[in-house]
Amino acid sequence: MATNFSDIVKQGYVKMKSRKLGIYRRCWLVFRKSSSKGPQRLEKYPDEKSVCLRGCPKVTEISNVKCVTRLPKETKRQAVAIIFTDDSARTFTCDSELEAEEWYKTLSVECLGSRLNDISLGEPDLLAPGVQCEQTDRFNVFLLPCPNLDVYGECKLQITHENIYLWDIHNPRVKLVSWPLCSLRRYGRDATRFTFEAGRMCDAGEGLYTFQTQEGEQIYQRVHSATLAIAEQHKRVLLEMEKNVRLLNKGTEHYSYPCTPTTMLPRSAYWHHITGSQNIAEASSYAGEGYGAAQASSETDLLNRFILLKPKPSQGDSSEAKTPSQ
């Protein structure tokens, strides 16, 4: 995990073509890779000092790139062009042919990724297509220090149908830590953060984990969708177990309800809607108390807006299933 991570891939003086006037003006160009601070982009400053003074640059987000190309020498010497899928372009010239070639190769690798088979850039990309596709499903986050973990900093976060994974920012094959979705007690987001609280059913241990990110809403929606899918699956298991018990006890006076499956359940805000058929009275009681509190809570509260609802725990799980204090 990178604690001293820098998102600057390349920078230097170039002459960039103005979109309005079509003339080339000298500027300090900074190419930043995607990170917890923002997407992949070009930042144009008047000079190098403006970067140190944290001036406000003109930003071009580098997404939906069709190709990166070198302009013919008879058209413009030492020039590089980024062509986007909407056929717009950003063109700049460099002070030397060597510098132009370096910009071209860097932009090609960072912007085109797996589409470099026809570009002679040295060693081939060793990542399999499946692994490369997987990279697009990872989010840029910065894990804030927490007592449970000895790692923090810039990393990649991935959500699957069962787990949340953290991957090393420099080596996409190195997994740093994981949390089962069923161990989440609550989760939330705001404009710059995604936060969740995990229980004891994970290797990292229980605790609150906070990530600085510009993609908090997308991460939240992924986690919430996966959590609801687990809840739906659990509901189907309960219904099937209840059906089997009814068949076994058919014709007898004694009726026993099925036991709750041993799998721990995610405690999302909508849990009681899905498991309400298991115990209508209990779900109604939770809903009456929970929703009143939820509606009274502030929209800006990152965690307290989420209701901690779960099915009634078995006696053996009573110590684990206690709702954490707010």
From Swiss-Prot:
It comes from the Eukaryota. Keywords: Phosphoprotein. Widely expressed. High expression in skeletal muscle, heart, kidney and liver. Weaker expression in spleen, lung and small intestine, brain, heart and. Expressed in both resting and activated peripheral blood T-cells. DOK proteins are enzymatically inert adaptor or scaffolding proteins. They provide a docking platform for the assembly of multimolecular signaling complexes. DOK4 functions in RET-mediated neurite outgrowth and plays a positive role in activation of the MAP kinase pathway. Putative link with downstream effectors of RET in neuronal differentiation. May be involved in the regulation of the immune response induced by T-cells. Residues 7-112 form the PH domain. Interacts with RET and TEK/TIE2. Interaction with RET is mediated through the PTB domain and requires phosphorylation of RET 'Tyr-1062'. GO terms for cellular component: cytoplasm; cytosol. One of its GO terms (biological process) is cell surface receptor protein tyrosine kinase signaling pathway. Belongs to the DOK family. Type B subfamily. Residues 132-237 form the IRS-type PTB domain. This is Docking protein 4. InterPro entries: Docking_Protein_DOK (IPR050996), DOK4/5/6_PH (IPR037816), IRS_PTB (IPR002404), PH-like_dom_sf (IPR011993), PH_domain (IPR001849). Phosphorylated on tyrosine residues in response to insulin, IGF1 or RET stimulation. PTB domain mediates receptor interaction. SUPFAM superfamilies: PH domain-like (SSF50729). It comes from Homo sapiens. The keyword Cell inner membrane does not apply. A motif (DKFBH motif) lies at residues 265-275.
